[in-house]
Amino acid sequence: MNGGREREDKIAMMEVEKETAAFAGLIEVSLQSSISSATKLFSTYPLRILYPKKVQFDKSVDCAWFYTVSYGGGLVSGDLVPMSVDVQKDCTASVCTQGTTKVYKSIKPSSANCTGNDVDSENTKTTKQTLEAKVGTNALLCWLPDPAQCFKDAKFEQVHEISLADDSSSLCFVDWITAGRVAHDDARWAFRSFLTRTTVTTGDDTVNVIESQRLENAASNNEEESLAKRMANAHVIASVILIGPRTEAARKKCAEYAKDSSKRTTNAASWLTAKSPLPAGVSYSLATASESKTQRMNEEGNEKDSLVLRVLASDIESAYAVLRECLQPLETEIGCPPYNERGGS
């Protein structure tokens, strides 16, 4: 009997090792005594995941909170950070960071370390971060990082693939980037390239959202062609994806805020048009995540269940203020207003 149990334990351990070997970070959340709890938690260099079991939030709200941290304060050239998150049925999880994700300059690898897979046509390494996430029935995942901050000459790529179990699954996903080290004039929007792509599917791989951005500096040294020139006084680009029944209040708040802000003229928001300069404050673009799905639901008399909010801001505090206000209704789901858990105003 003991021999059989030992073999089972060994096989189980091998499965865990195989699973964790594919990722720098792994989170699994399932119900334990009716409480959302981390039943699998793993991280390795360059990522560390913190799971505070005692949080000073509303204890009547069931939510598991996680914080990701980069060793050394940021990601260096060629770092690959694959992460897996599985939020199972009826659970709630929030994944945050403890500061901006700093991405340092891309460098040429030594010939001994040149594998051919992580080196591009310019013979420099790209830093890459990936996420594979699953959200179960009636579950909610809130992905609430601080923004990426790419240093001069950095190359950064993000790929997020999120699978929702069905229409009862809910998601709040924030993806954003700042201009970089704005205290240095030559480091503003001075990274080489930034690519981010988020794909959200439901059930039978029906695509809900494909949200992507690509920012690149021109190969020439012509200042007029530089990314900094093209971005004008924009300092932050952000996108927020809200899907599912548990984000309904936040979706309504986003729509109301954008509608109200379109009437403001100073230190606030206006609708962004292709040729207009960015005003002081914030500009918005608001859309449903799936036009075909929305049209079908409207014919049935039901409410839209998805929203994508895109934000341009002239400073990072304005962007934080927008996120705090628009996502504040999620407090009832996760126990604390997003981006306010560290005492933000």
Regions picked out by a protein language model, each given a short descriptive name:
Residues E15-E256:
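Conserved beta-strand/loop scaffold segments within soluble protein domains that form the structured core
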